[in-house]
Amino acid sequence: MVSVLVVGYKAFDLGIFGDKDQRLKIIKAAIRRDLIYLLENGMKWLVFTGNLGFEVWVLEVAKELQEEYNFQLATIFIFENQGENWNEANQEKLANFKNVDFIKYAYPSYENPSQFRTYNQFLLESTDGAYLFYDEENETKLKYLYRMMKENKQYHIKKLTFDDLNEMAENFSEI
């Protein structure tokens, strides 16, 4: 996978309401492990959609890894006004998504529901695969994008699972 779409749970989906949550250490350790694997297997681009939660944590780890690895970061927002109503702390996270190698907006603003499907299709057509933190047993609106990913047999999916995190937590004292 040369270009990898990053999508996953939002922080509130996981009950994480602050940057000091201890679970983030384990999540970020797992992200670091997975990104190194992807980088060592040819990844050149990480593509974000600008959502809070998993994408923020991947972006933070990726920016650290850019000191050691040569790869690019892109954010393709669905709307130009995405995040304009976020609080100050989240505005900083939005600014980080805009401080990448490539930024694009799919639409100026929301007009109709079909924009979401078209946007998801564009993301899948523009990337080779995805780095995904999602579990079908804990559904969110990500289920639609995940379903589209699975329908394309050529689309590669690298998943971070709750089992991965549990295993990482068991070994965390060694990290």
Curated annotation (Swiss-Prot):
Question: Which InterPro entries would you find in this protein's record?
Answer: YspA
Disulfide connectivity for this sequence is none
Task: Classify the source by domain of life.
Answer: Bacteria
Give the record's family classification. Belongs to the UPF0398 family.
Looking up HAMAP family in the UniProt record yields:
UPF0398
Q: Which PANTHER family match?
A: UPF0398 PROTEIN SPR0331, UPF0398 PROTEIN YPSA
Name this protein carries in UniProt: UPF0398 protein SGO_0588
Q: Which organism's genome codes for this protein? A: Streptococcus gordonii (strain Challis / ATCC 35105 / BCRC 15272 / CH1 / DL1 / V288)
Provide the taxonomic classification: Bacteria, Bacillati, Bacillota, Bacilli, Lactobacillales
